[in-house]
A protein has these predicted regions:
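Short beta-strand-centered segments that line the small-molecule binding cleft or hinge
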Residues: 92, 96-103, 107-121
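Serine residues within intrinsically disordered or low-complexity segments
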Residues: 2-3, 16, 32
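Short, solvent-exposed loop/turn segments at the edges of secondary structure
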Residues: 124-125, 273
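Bacterial N-terminal signal peptides
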Residues: 22-33
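Short polybasic linear motifs
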Residues: 2, 8-9
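Short, Lys/Arg-enriched N-terminal segments with co-localized hydrophobic residues
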Residues: 11-17
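Exported/periplasmic ABC-transporter solute-binding proteins
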Residues: 36-92, 103, 111-112, 132-317
Length: 317
C-alpha cells in the first residue's frame, strides 16, 4: 500500500497558518497573564523574615515549611552565629520579624531592653566532640581523656568563632571546665594549638562539611547538629558538656570575654546550661506575622516538628 502526500492549495495554507498563529498568540497571552497574576500574588503574599542560629537550620526547615503551607505566608530566612545575628540588629539596624538564638544570654546581654522586651526559651542542647570514621586516632577517643587525642600533633580540630557564635565561646568554656576538673594545666592551650585560624568558622554548622570532606578530624559541636548531619560524636561528661540543668552553678565557674553590642565593647560570658530562645524584636517590620510564627513554633505541632528535627524541646512555658 502506498500513500500520496496531499498539499493544501496556497490560499488554504495561508489561512491555516493564520489560524495557528492566532492560537499560538492566544496561548502566549494566557500564559503571560497567568504568570503576571502569579507574580502579583507572590508579591502580595504576607512576608515574615526569620533570623536564626546556624544550628537551628535543620530543625527549623520542616517547621517553617509547614507554617508557609498552612498560612500562605512567604518565609524569608537568615542564618548566622547568634552573636552576629544580634549585632545585625544593634549595629546595622537590620531587624527581622523573628529571631531565634542558640544562647538566651545573648538576648539579655545585647538585645534587652532596647531591641527586645521579652524572649522565650524553647529548647536545650549539649556540647559534644563530632568526628567521622576517617578521623585520625578515633579508636583512642574516650570521654575520660578525649583532650589528649585532640591535642596530638597530626590532628586537625575545628571550632566556631567565639566573637560570632555561642558554640565558639562554649568550646572555650568546655576546655576551661575540663582543665579545672582534671587538674591539667595547659589543656586549653594544647587543644587550641590544633585549631588554628584556618579551622575556625563563623558558625558551628559550617564545620560539618569540613568534617565530612576530611579537612577536619574533630569539631566541637552541638549534639543536635552532629545527629542531624549523620556524624559520629563523643558524649562528654555532664560536668563539662553544658547540658545539665542541675550543674548550672558548676558551669558558671568558667568564664570568657567576647565582643559586645557595639565595636569596642566586650561582655563576660559565664558557663551555663545551653538554652535556645526566640523573640519578636520591638521594631520588627512585620511584627504581627512574627508573633503568629512565634506562636506556631511554640504550639504543640511546632514543638513536635522541632523535636523531629533533632532539638531537645522544653515544656511549654
Amino acid at each position: 500500500m502506498s500513500f500520496t502526500a496531499y498539499r493544501l492549495p496556497p490560499t488554504a495554507r495561508i489561512l491555516s497558518l493564520m489560524r495557528i498563529a492566532r492560537t499560538t498568540l492566544l496561548a502566549v497571552s494566557l500564559a503571560s497573564a497567568v504568570g503576571c497574576r502569579d507574580a502579583r500574588s507572590r508579591a502580595a503574599a504576607p512576608t515574615v523574615v526569620v533570623s536564626y542560629a546556624g544550628s537551628l537550620a535543620h530543625p527549623f526547615a520542616a517547621a517553617l515549611d509547614e507554617y508557609a503551607r498552612r498560612t500562605g505566608v512567604r518565609v524569608v530566612t537568615q542564618s548566622a552565629g547568634s552573636l552576629e545575628a544580634a549585632r545585625r540588629i544593634t549595629e546595622l539596624g537590620d531587624v527581622p520579624d523573628l529571631i531565634a538564638l542558640a544562647d538566651e544570654d545573648v538576648f539579655a546581654s545585647l538585645l534587652v531592653p532596647r531591641h527586645v522586651d521579652r524572649y522565650t526559651v524553647f529548647a536545650r542542647n549539649r556540647m559534644v566532640i563530632a568526628y567521622t570514621p576517617s578521623s585520625r586516632h578515633a579508636d583512642a577517643l574516650d570521654s575520660a581523656s578525649w583532650w589528649r587525642t585532640l591535642a596530638r600533633p597530626d590532628v586537625e580540630v575545628g571550632r566556631s568563632d567565639p566573637s560570632l557564635d555561642p558554640n565558639g565561646y562554649r568550646t572555650l568554656l568546655v576546655l576551661r571546665l575540663t582543665e579545672r576538673q582534671y587538674g591539667e594545666p595547659g589543656l586549653e592551650r594544647s587543644v587550641l594549638a590544633r585549631s588554628p585560624a584556618r579551622n575556625v568558622r563563623p558558625k558551628s554548622s559550617d564545620l560539618v562539611a569540613l568534617l565530612q570532606a576530611g579537612a577536619l578530624d574533630y569539631a566541637f559541636a552541638y549534639e543536635s547538629v552532629a545527629r542531624s548531619a549523620g556524624l559520629r560524636w563523643l558524649a562528654l561528661p555532664s560536668s563539662i558538656d553544658l547540658g545539665d540543668e542541675a550543674r548550672a552553678a558548676d558551669y558558671a565557674r568558667a568564664a570568657v570575654r567576647v565582643a559586645g553590642a557595639s565595636p569596642g565593647d566586650s561582655i563576660t560570658v559565664h558557663g551555663a546550661p545551653i538554652h535556645y530562645a526566640l523573640a519578636v524584636p520591638l521594631r520588627a517590620p512585620h511584627a504581627a506575622e512574627g508573633e503568629r510564627l512565634r506562636d506556631f513554633l511554640l504550639s504543640p505541632i511546632g514543638r513536635r516538628l522541632l523535636t523531629q528535627g533533632g532539638l531537645d524541646v522544653v515544656s511549654a512555658p
